[in-house]
């Protein structure tokens, strides 16, 4: 898959993802908490607060929420700039409340982390950096300039400067850490979501191709008799019109076109007959079907199929599941792309498992990313090697992820490794020296039960 500027999976395009309703609900929660804190602090704790100014600050949020609720539709999506402005308003309103209520002597100064965390989850990194810098600036301002908290006896509440500095430093570190951490988590979630979408699209495409093949096969079967009739009649006309060359040539053209239609339908429906007998096949045939698009690409593809201890001499008959064929095909494509000359595909079976191994004679996986192979958007081989072996190709790092996801959906376990030490010299490396992928299924997840019915008998009405 190619990452294009207008592609559905373009990860850099994240505008219009957040609904205005979501931020409105969060703001209502903040308003309720602020009102509760102000009332409890003034009425029950006996701290004298400038209630008028405090209620004015909270009222600004209430007015903004009411206007947003009645002016804009509930399903309104926010652009990057609009979301930034809303979060800046909330950050400024909270900082003003801190200015009125003691600055860093107010433990609720910790809430200044909330807008930055939301930005890290929802907005891009530049917006989050801007919001974080403004938050640190406002926090520093309220640390030096604020109205003191006056207790009931008229004394002001103060804390040691060292404690105040420590609280400021803790919040600054929290802004930096939570901003980066929430951003990283959001990227991981979005990457996984995009990759799963790509996987589902690949599986749907494979399923649609299979369904289309079945439709074509049925059409070829239904059109067989009319085409045969056209061919027979045109042949008879050609014989009867032997003395009229012009008309005879027309009859010959009709016969040739009927043959062409037959050949086209036969070739299109060869792989798509939708009967249950064609939904299963020997392990070797299914592997060859998966490898077929990559056999003629200039690399030698060798198959080796054998039973292991306790396995039957005959190849197991397995289901031709689209996710199995497409997943194995992706693994074979990756091996062919990076092999020097040869790809080996081994099939092995026992009484309780089926295993396939795909090995190439390329450079193998970089040791630094072997543990991450199968994660979305990870380039699986060295960049310079990828460009030389796949010129003009700009992948998304989804090939092995799609293969791994599809095969695991079928019940398989995958493992990735290098067949040899990548730091060995050329003459020291064995023939099978590149990347190796092993896929193992339990027998009951893949093998067709012998002597099982192929399907329901069709009721014949007489």
Curated annotation (Swiss-Prot):
Q: Which UniProt keywords apply?
A: ATP-binding, Cell inner membrane, Cell membrane, Kinase, Membrane, Nucleotide-binding, Phosphoprotein, Transferase, Transmembrane, Transmembrane helix, Two-component regulatory system
Q: Which residues cross the membrane?
A: 26-45, 52-70, 79-96, 104-123, 130-149, 165-182
Q: Which residues lie on this side of the membrane: Extracellular?
A: 46-51, 97-103, 150-164
Q: Where is the Histidine kinase domain?
A: 218-445
Topological type in the membrane = Multi-pass membrane protein
Q: What is its EC number?
A: 2.7.13.3
Q: Which domain of life is it from?
A: Bacteria
List the stretches on the Cytoplasmic face of the membrane: 1-25, 71-78, 124-129, 183-462
What Pfam families does this protein map onto? HATPase_c, HisKA
Q: Where in the cell is it found?
A: Cell inner membrane
In which broad location class does this protein mainly occur, judging by the first location in its UniProt entry? membrane
Function per UniProt? Member of the two-component regulatory system RegB/RegA. Involved in the positive regulation of photosynthesis gene expression in response to anaerobiosis. Also involved in positive regulation of the cbbI and cbbII Calvin cycle CO2 fixation operons, as well as in regulation of expression of genes involved in alternative CO2 fixation pathways. Phosphorylates RegA/PrrA.
The protein's name: Sensor histidine kinase RegB
Q: Which organism is it from?
A: Cereibacter sphaeroides (Rhodobacter sphaeroides)
Q: What is the lineage of its organism?
A: Bacteria, Pseudomonadati, Pseudomonadota, Alphaproteobacteria, Rhodobacterales
